[in-house]
């Protein structure tokens, strides 16, 4: 039972990391308030700027 729980937890963490992958187009744009717009143009739900990098949400 513990093994199944650990496997599910690891898969959840990996999927969360993949869902918020950085967007290189927004990074090149400087990520100054236009991150959400760029992510929406790419068909993503939205985005957030963190440490100068834009992260798009699926």
Swiss-Prot record:
Residues 1-19 form the signal peptide. The record marks 57 as: Aromatic residue of the functional dyad. The keyword Cell division does not apply. It is found in: Secreted. Disulfide bonds join 31-49, 35-54, 39-56. The keyword Mitochondrion does not apply. Its main location: secreted. It comes from the Eukaryota. The record marks 48 as: Basic residue of the functional dyad. Expressed by the venom gland. GO terms for cellular component: extracellular region. Has the structural arrangement of an alpha-helix connected to antiparallel beta-sheets by disulfide bonds (CS-alpha/beta). Belongs to the short scorpion toxin superfamily. Potassium channel inhibitor family. Alpha-KTx 26 subfamily. Inhibits voltage-gated potassium channels. This is Potassium channel toxin alpha-KTx 26.2. It comes from Lychas mucronatus (Chinese swimming scorpion).
């Amino acid at each position: 039972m513990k093994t199944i729980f650990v496997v599910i937890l690891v898969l959840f963490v990996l999927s969360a990391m993949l869902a918020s992958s950085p967007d290189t187009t927004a990074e090149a744009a400087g990520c100054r308030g236009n991150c959400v717009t760029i992510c929406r143009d790419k068909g993503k739900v939205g985005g957030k700027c963190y440490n100068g990098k834009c992260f798009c949400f699926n």
